[in-house]
Protein backbone atom coordinates (compact mmCIF):
# COMPACT_ATOMS: atom_id res chain seq x y z
CA UNK A 1 0.00 0.00 0.00
CA UNK A 2 1.50 3.30 -1.06
CA UNK A 3 1.68 5.89 1.68
CA UNK A 4 3.05 9.38 2.10
CA UNK A 5 3.75 11.08 5.44
CA UNK A 6 3.50 14.88 5.43
CA UNK A 7 4.45 15.45 9.07
CA UNK A 8 0.83 15.45 10.26
CA UNK A 9 -1.08 12.85 8.22
CA UNK A 10 -0.50 9.68 6.25
CA UNK A 11 -1.92 9.85 2.74
CA UNK A 12 -2.95 6.58 1.09
CA UNK A 13 -4.17 6.11 -2.46
CA UNK A 14 -7.12 3.87 -3.30
CA UNK A 15 -10.17 3.47 -5.51
CA UNK A 16 -13.87 3.62 -4.69
CA UNK A 17 -14.33 0.01 -5.80
CA UNK A 18 -11.85 -1.52 -3.34
CA UNK A 19 -13.50 -3.16 -0.35
CA UNK A 20 -11.04 -1.71 2.18
CA UNK A 21 -11.73 1.80 0.86
CA UNK A 22 -15.47 1.30 1.17
CA UNK A 23 -15.06 -0.06 4.70
CA UNK A 24 -13.14 3.04 5.75
CA UNK A 25 -16.05 5.09 4.43
CA UNK A 26 -18.35 3.20 6.82
CA UNK A 27 -15.98 3.08 9.82
CA UNK A 28 -13.09 5.57 9.94
CA UNK A 29 -11.14 3.75 12.68
CA UNK A 30 -7.97 2.36 11.10
CA UNK A 31 -4.61 0.83 11.92
CA UNK A 32 -1.59 1.06 9.64
CA UNK A 33 1.66 -0.90 9.93
CA UNK A 34 4.73 0.07 7.93
CA UNK A 35 7.61 -2.40 7.88
CA UNK A 36 11.20 -1.79 6.86
CA UNK A 37 13.99 -4.28 6.25
CA UNK A 38 16.88 -1.96 5.56
CA UNK A 39 19.01 -0.59 7.00
CA UNK A 40 17.51 -2.18 10.14
CA UNK A 41 14.43 -4.38 10.38
CA UNK A 42 11.58 -2.77 12.26
CA UNK A 43 8.14 -1.33 11.95
CA UNK A 44 5.86 1.42 13.09
CA UNK A 45 2.17 1.05 13.70
CA UNK A 46 -0.42 3.76 14.07
CA UNK A 47 -4.05 3.75 15.09
CA UNK A 48 -6.12 6.70 14.03
CA UNK A 49 -9.02 8.14 12.14
CA UNK A 50 -9.25 8.13 8.36
CA UNK A 51 -11.16 10.38 6.03
CA UNK A 52 -12.02 9.46 2.44
CA UNK A 53 -11.38 12.38 0.07
CA UNK A 54 -12.43 12.37 -3.56
CA UNK A 55 -12.98 14.67 -6.50
CA UNK A 56 -14.50 17.09 -7.11
CA UNK A 57 -14.72 18.13 -3.45
CA UNK A 58 -10.97 17.54 -2.97
CA UNK A 59 -8.20 17.82 -5.58
CA UNK A 60 -6.47 14.46 -5.09
CA UNK A 61 -4.03 14.80 -7.98
CA UNK A 62 -1.16 16.82 -6.45
CA UNK A 63 -0.79 14.29 -3.62
CA UNK A 64 -1.41 11.36 -5.97
CA UNK A 65 1.44 12.64 -8.11
CA UNK A 66 3.72 12.87 -5.05
CA UNK A 67 2.90 9.23 -4.27
CA UNK A 68 3.76 8.23 -7.85
CA UNK A 69 7.01 10.21 -7.67
CA UNK A 70 7.92 8.37 -4.47
CA UNK A 71 7.16 4.85 -5.68
CA UNK A 72 7.40 4.94 -9.49
CA UNK A 73 9.97 7.70 -9.84
CA UNK A 74 11.95 6.70 -6.75
CA UNK A 75 13.04 10.32 -6.40
CA UNK A 76 14.93 10.27 -9.71
CA UNK A 77 13.98 13.05 -12.19
CA UNK A 78 15.05 10.70 -15.00
CA UNK A 79 11.89 8.70 -14.25
CA UNK A 80 9.54 11.65 -14.93
CA UNK A 81 8.06 10.03 -18.05
CA UNK A 82 7.18 6.89 -16.09
CA UNK A 83 5.57 9.02 -13.37
CA UNK A 84 3.58 10.99 -15.98
CA UNK A 85 2.33 7.76 -17.58
CA UNK A 86 1.39 6.28 -14.22
CA UNK A 87 -0.53 9.37 -13.11
CA UNK A 88 -2.32 9.51 -16.49
CA UNK A 89 -3.45 5.91 -15.92
CA UNK A 90 -4.54 6.73 -12.35
CA UNK A 91 -6.73 9.50 -13.73
CA UNK A 92 -8.74 6.92 -15.71
CA UNK A 93 -9.80 5.19 -12.47
CA UNK A 94 -12.27 6.24 -9.74
CA UNK A 95 -9.41 7.30 -7.43
CA UNK A 96 -9.67 8.52 -3.86
CA UNK A 97 -7.22 9.56 -1.16
CA UNK A 98 -7.38 8.44 2.43
CA UNK A 99 -6.13 10.97 4.98
CA UNK A 100 -5.10 9.13 8.15
CA UNK A 101 -4.68 11.19 11.30
CA UNK A 102 -2.58 9.17 13.78
CA UNK A 103 -3.71 9.05 17.41
CA UNK A 104 -1.57 6.19 18.81
CA UNK A 105 1.96 5.29 17.67
CA UNK A 106 3.91 2.04 18.19
CA UNK A 107 7.42 1.22 17.03
CA UNK A 108 9.64 -1.85 17.13
CA UNK A 109 13.37 -1.72 16.46
CA UNK A 110 14.58 -5.23 15.64
CA UNK A 111 18.19 -4.45 16.61
CA UNK A 112 17.40 -5.90 20.03
CA UNK A 113 17.46 -9.37 18.45
CA UNK A 114 20.76 -11.25 18.08
CA UNK A 115 21.84 -10.97 14.47
CA UNK A 116 19.68 -7.87 14.09
CA UNK A 117 17.00 -9.93 12.35
CA UNK A 118 13.86 -11.34 13.88
CA UNK A 119 12.93 -13.52 10.95
CA UNK A 120 12.73 -17.26 10.26
CA UNK A 121 16.32 -17.38 9.00
CA UNK A 122 17.57 -16.26 12.40
CA UNK A 123 15.16 -18.52 14.30
CA UNK A 124 16.18 -21.61 12.31
CA UNK A 125 19.89 -21.02 13.00
CA UNK A 126 19.47 -20.61 16.76
Regions inferred by a protein language model and the residue ranges of each:
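Short beta-strand segments
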Residues: 1-16, 22, 30-36, 43-46
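Charged, gly/pro-rich active-site loop segments
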Residues: 42-126
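A generic structural signal for alpha-helix starts
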Residues: 18-19, 58
Amino acid sequence: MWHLWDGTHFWISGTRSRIWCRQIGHDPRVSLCIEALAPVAGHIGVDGTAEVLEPPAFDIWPLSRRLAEKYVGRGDPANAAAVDAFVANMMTEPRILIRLTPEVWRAIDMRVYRGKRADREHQDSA
